[in-house]
Amino acid sequence: MKLCRFKNAESEVRVGLAVDESTIADLSAAGVESITSLLEDTNSTQRISDLAERDLPQLALSEVKLLTPVEGQEVWAAGVTYLRSKKARMEESDFSANAYDLVYEAARPEIFFKSLPNKVVGPGEAVGIREDSKWNVPEPELTLVINSAKQLVGYTIGNDMSSRDIEGENLLYLPQAKVYDRSCAVGPWIVVGANEAEV
């Protein structure tokens, strides 16, 4: 099942559920106020399944504007998620190379703050790049959706923009290299009720 946020022809922000590749059901017509409230439900997968069975208004995707599914949440990211990334970062920075020695071995996860919701862009919107960087790169990510009870409730996709030359100059510059206006894109869909193999 795939959830989304969208604007309808009247510019109202609504919550939708994919019916097929070109149609969504309007969950807001059933009283769903937000994706967050839906995913905070301890039995969210069953609730969404029940909603899918209802006779709700349907809209063509071509008639709506898909939005990022991030409503009011922070976005956090896991750093250096594959071995090639670790090696590249060690090669790019004499100053910071030793900082990556403990990646995958440290007791604490390599997680860092990425974005506030107002800096996240949605589907079809341009991501930002830093003007003072000569090497801005997109980093496509599998994105986990976790509710306030720390339950994994869904998956989406993200794009973590990075200014690699700034990061490579000094590891302490990581926030400047990662957190800036439009440095994060998320969505449009949140896949719920799927196991890891299906994602």
Description of each model-found segment:
Residues 4, 46-199:
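Active-site microenvironments in enzyme catalytic cores
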Residues 2-44:
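Gly/serine-rich nucleotide phosphate-binding loop at the start of the catalytic core
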